[in-house]
């Protein structure tokens, strides 16, 4: 835990303030109305071993479920890092891969070291993950940036643990970029819970949304003058994952700046 009680209190007050705003916000948008919104990728680096992380997990859940920011379609990734696992509790959702992804952002933002909770919005802004006010501002700003168009179509395969996915990625004509950008595909799972027995959150029941299960680079985004990219992928699921809680997330990310140029999310086809 790297932050003082004063900072924790500030984060809590901000969360309460946003929660009040959320209660007055519109109901969650249907898939048809979501198309009128600009996709914004919100990543939360978190851990079940970090005492300041549960409020950030709650904030991400509210952002993802209520979609309270006008003009923004919030696409969440909850990424559990593994460097807290030495403190008495091993986070079963953690991965060294997510720790490495966070370190790339640390280098990009010229930070001194990684910390939790950390929220990163569209790869362009970062802040303490339980700060609702900063989250709202960053998401609003991101929703005004032009994005490349992405669509996802899923078709159930013969086996229950495989999903065929067709991805369409538009060219980067609308995005202000001069550098190569990669196409990534992720699987996330909602509704995960843990009864923490040790560490800073001992005795707490923690709930998670959009927990990152897998993440793979699957292609290179088409340049401004190129034809749209069409990819067909087979996405594998573990039998322990609940299919009804799974989403497939696709996003385009610049290699150097790590800016997100476009994103999309779809439920796994039954």
Question: Where on the chain are the PLM-derived regions?
Answer:
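Short, conserved sequence motifs used for protein processing/export or organelle targeting and
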Residues: 90-118, 124-270
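Generic anion/oxyanion-binding catalytic loop in active/binding sites
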Residues: 14, 39, 124
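Active-site-proximal cofactor/substrate-binding loop regions of enzyme domains
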Residues: 21-115
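Bacterial N-terminal signal peptides that target proteins for export
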Residues: 1-11
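Hydrophobic h-region of N-terminal signal peptides that target proteins for export
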Residues: 12-21
């Amino acid at each position: 835990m790297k932050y003082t009680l004063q900072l924790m209190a500030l984060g809590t007050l901000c969360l309460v303030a946003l929660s009040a705003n959320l209660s007055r916000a519109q109901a969650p948008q249907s898939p048809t109305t979501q198309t009128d919104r600009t996709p914004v990728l919100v990543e939360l680096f978190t851990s079940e071993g970090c005492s300041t992380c549960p409020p950030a997990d709650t904030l991400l859940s509210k952002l993802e479920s209520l979609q309270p920011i006008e003009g923004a379609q919030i696409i969440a990734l909850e990424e559990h890092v593994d460097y807290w696992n030495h403190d008495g509790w091993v986070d079963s959702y953690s991965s060294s891969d997510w720790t490495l992804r966070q370190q790339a952002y640390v280098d990009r933002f010229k930070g001194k070291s990684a910390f939790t909770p950390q929220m990163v919005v569209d790869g362009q802004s970062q802040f303490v993950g339980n700060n609702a006010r900063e989250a709202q501002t960053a998401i609003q700003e991101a929703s005004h940036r032009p994005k490349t168009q992405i669509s996802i179509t899923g078709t159930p395969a013969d086996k229950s643990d495989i999903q065929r996915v067709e991805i369409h990625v538009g060219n980067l004509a609308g995005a202000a970029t001069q550098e190569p950008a990669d196409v990534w595909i992720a699987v996330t799972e909602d509704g995960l819970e843990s009864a923490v027995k040790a560490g800073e959150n001992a005795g707490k029941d923690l709930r998670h949304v959009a927990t990152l299960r897998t993440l793979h680079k699957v292609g290179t985004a088409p340049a401004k003058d190129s034809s749209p990219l069409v990819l067909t992928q087979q996405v594998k699921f573990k039998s322990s994952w609940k299919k009804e809680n799974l989403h497939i997330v696709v996003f385009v990310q610049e290699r150097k700046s790590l800016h997100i140029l476009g994103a999309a999310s779809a439920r796994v086809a039954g």
